[in-house]
Amino acid sequence: MTIINSNLGYPRLGEHREWKHLLEHFWKGQLDNVTFHATAKKLRLANLKKQRDLGVDYIPVADNSDYDHVLDTLVAFNAIPSRFGHFDHQLDLPDYYAIARGTDTAVAAEMTKWFNINYHYIVPEFDDVSFKLLDNRWLRYYQEAKQELGIDGKPVILGPISFLKLGKRHGQYLDDAAVNELLPQLLPLYQQVFEELATAGAKWIQLDEPTLVKTTTVAELAPYQTALEHLHAAVPSLKIELQTYFDSLDQYDKIVTWPIQALGLDLVHDHGENLAHLVDHGFPTDKILAAGIIDGHNVWASDLQAKLALVQQLRQIVTDDQLWLQPANSLLHVPITTKNETKADPVLLGGLAFADQKLAELHTLTVAANQGVAAVQAVFDHNQANLTALNQSSHRNNQSVRAAEAQLSNQKFERQAPFATRIKLQHDRLHLPLLPTTTIGSFPQSAQVRAKRAAWRKGNLTDADYQAFLHAETKRWIKLQEDLGLDVLVHGEFERTDMVEYFGQKLTGFYATQNGWVQSYGSRGVRPPVIFGDVAYTEPITVAESVYAQSLTDQPVKGMLTAPLTIINWSFVRDDIPRAQVQNQIALALRQEVQNLEKAGIKIIQVDEPALREGLPLKQRHWQAYLDEAVYSFKITTTGVQNDTQIHTHMCYSNFADIINTIKALDADVISIETSRSHGEIISAFEQTGYDQEIGLGVYDIHSPRVPSVAEIEANIQRALRVIDARQFWINPDCGLKTRQESETLAALKNMIAARNAIQAQLTTSIH
């Protein structure tokens, strides 16, 4: 009897972002369809071959995508919104991308976070849907791997219940009644996919049902069980690996009895609950336990001794031929390899493991389990030495940080006066009109901006020349903002590659990777910083840029910071101390930056917390602790200023109805929220609960290249004003504008100002 290993999914971007560049060249018309598909195939096959070379026994296929796997699923099953047309065949690339990116006449499909991590998926729309199988992509990619590489892969498909539950009908996520209504129409198509795979020789299929971890009652299990019983009965020769991840299964004892041949459990992010279920209830002798023992969305090297001890514990529950070792979730959410991190501190590098290194760890653990540790003793010894060196390093033992942490309990973090008092002082100081306009922070980073930054980083541009260029670009955009008629300006953030990475480069305890790219949405890659040590403030981060921008105009320019929780939610966070401790270290550092901005004369300071909602634990029983920690760290950051300094915050891509009280507890003077793609859900939430502070609900979607009309923006503003007093309301886009083209940005902002002016003229009330 032998233990084997399995992978759940592999990163798409490419080791040097080849996939990203492929998509963007196609969108710009620089590639034809034939070249696109040939290049995409080359990348797919290279990824499969690499996994085979790294010793993966069961290699996933069809986990690749041309944009997003949920989009792939809705396109395959014809859940295509009617505004994009009607189809009876596999979509060509322009039609496929229109759904994700929008067109001049059709608004892009909504995009939101994939569970509680920084990946975005396209939200299916099930209004008047007529399911049919337009493309069995799972069969195509299974056959490709088999024919080209001789790999008998494991097709990966999003399960029918998760597919439905991740989508919306009439603007609302589907409840169980809606799922039960649509499931009979969808199941025959899944059955067809399964049948065609079985006919082609597939032995296993990985059926991802990630929403299963969010079920808490037996009643919620019914549609999952119905689907699995149907599929197994219809295609008994195709073995089903029911894969879950990101948390534990509350109804494990029921789920494990279903007609599946393998159950994939997350043993990393489960709060220890899945392992407790296994110990308490055991595991059926006729199924495979696919044990997710390697962290698939953090970058730390595993403690191989501890992981092998876990494997030995699992061997007390199942036999070796019942045990697969695998990542806890798809490796889509980590960078590809550490081999390109040539500038990293060797002590840090020894503690890192990206996708390829994680697969190597799996192989090592598989060998150790089957042949004994002696077969890989050198690898184990090297692993322990690396982990010890990192944990004992000065990076993780900063005594000044420890002293500051020790004083936290002795301090009260509240603004000096209540909001009603503060806002009057701020109005007197700022002299803003009714319905003030602003943007969220960043402006388009042109090819020239990126080229100058790259040249500077390579040493081909002096510091002085680079600074002169940044000043020129800032000056140009201050003038553009004034000409547009914006009321509160921003400096544009041309010095920043990323709203989190930039801060990581300025604080201790962070490592900015050279090539640690992960997919955020579509072709957009981000390089999350690695928080590997104690975080401390050493010098001003944003003050010089903000002061320079303010010197160019009499209008207020916002200082722009990223809040602690977003920094850790969008970073790879050290796992040797609690996340809340890291969060508070960052807050203490940023508090000094906020105070330095105020001392430099900046009147408005925006502390962005876009990732607050998305980072919520999947199970509600864990929410309150998370939210309390979020409020606490935000207040550490923002409460050290005077009453007439206005604190803004921004949030995006989230459903806020269930955290309105937390938003209020932040006590920000002004909050801006992304709303355009969520079709008014957030407006409804504020209508139900009320909100006293000032607020900007994004009036147009920046994630699409289309330019909204004045009438469209006016309608969005008018809808918000039915719920929110005009004296509280700000006018702004959804999010930052870094990824947009300059022409799109200027046209959209021009229309936004025109819409504001038209509505402003209709209002007789003034807040000043």
Curated annotation (Swiss-Prot):
Pfam families attached to this UniProt entry: Meth_synt_1, Meth_synt_2
Gene3D superfamilies: 3.20.20.210
Pathway terms, separated by semicolons: Amino-acid biosynthesis; L-methionine biosynthesis via de novo pathway; L-methionine from L-homocysteine (MetE route): step 1/1
Keyword ATP-binding listed: no
SUPFAM superfamilies: UROD/MetE-like
Named cofactor requirement(s): Zn(2+)
Reaction catalysed by this enzyme: 5-methyltetrahydropteroyltri-L-glutamate + L-homocysteine = tetrahydropteroyltri-L-glutamate + L-methionine
Listed InterPro entries: Cbl-indep_Met_Synth_N, Cobalamin-indep_Met_synthase, Met_Synth_C/arc, UROD/MetE-like_sf
GO molecular function terms noted in the UniProt entry: 5-methyltetrahydropteroyltriglutamate-homocysteine S-methyltransferase activity; zinc ion binding
Source taxon at top rank: Bacteria
Positions of L-homocysteine binding: 440-442, 493, 608
Record-stated family: Belongs to the vitamin-B12 independent methionine synthase family.
Function field: Catalyzes the transfer of a methyl group from 5-methyltetrahydrofolate to homocysteine resulting in methionine formation.
The protein, known as: 5-methyltetrahydropteroyltriglutamate--homocysteine methyltransferase
Organism: Lactiplantibacillus plantarum (strain ATCC BAA-793 / NCIMB 8826 / WCFS1) (Lactobacillus plantarum)
